[in-house]
């Protein structure tokens, strides 16, 4: 990374966790990612989910067809793990270069996760093969027991599910996605080279007070849910530490406006258009701009065993205002930081 006055030049970043959806939604949101990101790990929780090599290839083709002319963007596909998935399908997809990783959703933990895994024991054969071939496991790390408070579900998952899983499969590469708690940050930083984590813009910039005080701000509602400010501060300190197993994952998850602004609104924040500006803002606030490029552009490729991108982007320290709404056919999206401004723009 080079810095000259108010310009930061960094390797083109990658997004290691994104929801691109499909059809009109895909066509609407993809340009906000493909413009500045070289690659993205694409979540498989469509309806129906991506559980086969054939469906992953077809979805990748739909994504590539929606990439605007002039953008050099490569989607990295994932397989949705289920209790009944054939392990050979996973291995075949990975060896063919179709699947980059496999995603573990605890059943009913988040959007479109009803087909998810009911118990790690049911997929032990798959995990054994993934460990053998070096295929990363991506985890939505929350328990789904209704007796566990929603704000405690990540910490409980680490204690009761993730740690035993890592003991059973010590050389399985694991990414604990969108971490939100002090417990998760400490656990990952204390881990070994087989454990990494992604962190979203919203969990670095906001805490649950921002979502709940003075009125409910539905467009900050996501899963895992925003936590108290002590957890937010722990995440900020974690990225500022320079740990090379923490990297960018926006978890950008668009929903139409009417699906967010309802009596039972959907979980998900569409942040692709503001993500890099947000990360730069947070890293500057933490006096850690020298760590920004590694978080955005270097740590992820290193963990996945992929080359870094050979192109660059620039972040300029100048005000940028984000749109109030984004058209979605006859509907619209309300983006992260709608109508607000930050002091870092991307070129």
UniProtKB/Swiss-Prot annotation:
Pathway: Pyrimidine metabolism; UMP biosynthesis via de novo pathway; (S)-dihydroorotate from bicarbonate: step 3/3. One of its GO terms (cellular component) is cytosol. Keywords: Hydrolase, Metal-binding, Pyrimidine biosynthesis, Zinc. It is an enzyme of class 3 (hydrolase). Zn(2+) 2 binds at residues 103, 140, 178. InterPro entries: Amidohydro-rel, DHOdimr, Dihydroorotase_CS, Metal_Hydrolase. GO terms for molecular function: dihydroorotase activity; zinc ion binding. The active site is at residue 251. It catalyses: (S)-dihydroorotate + H2O = N-carbamoyl-L-aspartate + H(+). Pfam families: Amidohydro_1. CDD domains: DHOase. Zn(2+) 1 binds at residues 17, 19, 103, 251. Its cofactor is Zn(2+). Binds 2 Zn(2+) ions per subunit. The modification N6-carboxylysine is found at residue 103. The keyword Zinc applies. Homodimer. Catalyzes the reversible cyclization of carbamoyl aspartate to dihydroorotate. This is Dihydroorotase. The gene is pyrC.
């Amino acid at each position: 990374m080079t810095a000259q006055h108010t310009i930061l030049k960094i390797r083109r970043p990658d997004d290691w966790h994104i929801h691109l959806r499909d059809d009109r939604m895909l066509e609407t949101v993809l340009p906000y990612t493909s413009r500045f990101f070289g690659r993205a790990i694409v979540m498989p929780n469509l309806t129906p989910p991506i559980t086969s090599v054939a469906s992953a290839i077809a979805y990748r083709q739909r994504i590539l067809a929606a990439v605007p002319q002039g953008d050099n963007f490569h989607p990295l596909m994932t397989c949705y793990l289920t209790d009944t998935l054939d392990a050979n399908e996973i291995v075949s997809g990975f060896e063919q270069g179709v699947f980059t990783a496999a995603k573990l959703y605890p059943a009913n933990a988040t959007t479109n996760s009803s087909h998810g895994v009911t118990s790690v024991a049911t997929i032990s054969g798959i995990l054994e093969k993934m460990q053998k071939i070096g295929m990363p496991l991506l985890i939505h790390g929350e328990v789904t027991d209704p007796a566990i408070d929603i704000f405690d579900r990540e910490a409980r998952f680490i204690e009761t599910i993730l740690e035993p899983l890592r003991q059973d499969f010590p050389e399985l590469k694991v990414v604990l996605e969108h971490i939100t708690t002090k417990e998760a940050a400490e656990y990952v930083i204390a881990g070994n080279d087989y454990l990494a984590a992604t962190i979203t813009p919203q969990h670095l910039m906001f805490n649950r007070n921002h979502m709940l005080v003075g009125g409910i701000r539905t467009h900050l509602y996501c899963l895992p849910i925003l936590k108290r400010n002590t957890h937010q501060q722990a995440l900020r300190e974690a990225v500022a530490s320079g740990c090379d197993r923490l990297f960018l994952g926006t978890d950008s998850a668009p929903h139409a406006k009417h699906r967010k602004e309802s009596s039972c609104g959907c979980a998900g924040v569409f942040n692709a258009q503001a993500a890099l500006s947000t990360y730069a803002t947070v890293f500057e606030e933490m006096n850690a701009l020298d760590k920004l490029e590694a978080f955005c552009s270097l740590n992820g490729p290193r963990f996945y065993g992929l080359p870094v991108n050979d192109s660059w982007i620039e972040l300029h320290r100048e005000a940028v205002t984000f749109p109030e709404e984004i058209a979605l056919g006859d509907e619209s999206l309300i983006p992260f930081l709608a109508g607000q401004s930050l002091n870092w723009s991307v070129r």
